[in-house]
């Protein structure tokens, strides 16, 4: 799997990033990060797509 890295803000380099690798998904910045397995990430994406998680 080719790693994917996306910043949550296109206007600066200080915002959290989402990094997807063969080992899992990391969301955050510096020490403020959460690590998800691929299964956990897929569940999160599914919840969003099904409308169970929405903008706040």
For each predicted feature, which ranges?
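Positively charged, low-complexity terminal tracts
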Residues: 1-56
């Amino acid at each position: 799997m080719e790693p994917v890295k996306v910043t949550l803000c296109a206007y600066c380099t200080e915002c959290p990033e989402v990094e997807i690798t063969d080992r899992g998904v990391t969301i955050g910045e510096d020490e403020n990060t959460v690590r998800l397995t691929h299964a956990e990430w897929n569940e999160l994406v599914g919840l969003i797509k099904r409308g169970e998680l929405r903008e706040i």
